[in-house]
Amino acid sequence: RPPGFTPF
């Protein structure tokens, strides 16, 4: 996270 980064 935030959405746009994976797997964060």
UniProtKB/Swiss-Prot annotation:
It is found in: Secreted. GO terms for cellular component: extracellular region. Its main location: secreted. Signal peptide: none annotated. The keyword Secreted applies. GO terms for biological process: defense response; vasodilation. One of its GO terms (molecular function) is toxin activity. Expressed by the skin glands. Keywords: Amphibian defense peptide, G-protein coupled receptor impairing toxin, Secreted, Toxin, Vasoactive, Vasodilator. Produces in vitro relaxation of rat arterial smooth muscle and constriction of intestinal smooth muscle. May target bradykinin receptors (BDKRB). Belongs to the bradykinin-related peptide family. This is Des-Arg9-[Thr6]-bradykinin.
